[in-house]
Amino acid sequence: HETDSDGQVMNSMIEALTELQEMIVNLRYAFLTVHKARSFGSGSERLYVSNKEIKTFEPLKEICEEAGGHIPSPQLENQNKAFANVLERHNKAAYLVVGDSANFTNWAAGQPNEADGTCVKADTHGFWHSASCDEKLLVVCEFYFIL
């Protein structure tokens, strides 16, 4: 665009940029409000969501990644509780991932027991059990936002 002598094109671009900046601020505020409300309700910054499907471990991993999430990996007691609330609501167990250097664990009595399998599942009370990766369990994905 050629600028006229009064700089009207430049002024209109500055106005448009200012409007866009205001929209971004408003969208960020709306997003953070919804995120905080969901976190307040669950007690966790992480969000655990089920699509109600039943899958083995590998398809679950793909489903969660395609949705922009991950297989649940609770790092704190409140995260595990939020995860367990989803399982209790659906009355089903689900897979989770436990890191090698996990600071938080919630193994059930007698667990882990690799004879039961190399994957890990959580029951409706949030206790963790060794499991076969071929077991069909509730699909639950974990989402979290870092801003």
Curated annotation (Swiss-Prot):
Gene3D superfamilies: Mannose-Binding Protein A, subunit A
Methyltransferase recorded as keyword: no
Limits of the C-type lectin domain: 62-143
Keyword field contains DNA-binding: no
GO molecular function per UniProt: carbohydrate binding; phospholipase A2 inhibitor activity
PROSITE patterns linked to this entry: C_TYPE_LECTIN_1 (PS00615), C_TYPE_LECTIN_2 (PS50041)
Complex formation: Homo- or heterotrimer; homotrimer of PLI-A chains, two PLI-A and one PLI-B chains, one PLI-A and two PLI-B chains, and homotrimer of PLI-B chains (with a ratio of 1:3:3:1).
Family, per entry: Belongs to the alpha-type phospholipase A2 inhibitor family.
Protein name: Phospholipase A2 inhibitor subunit B
Organism: Protobothrops flavoviridis (Habu)
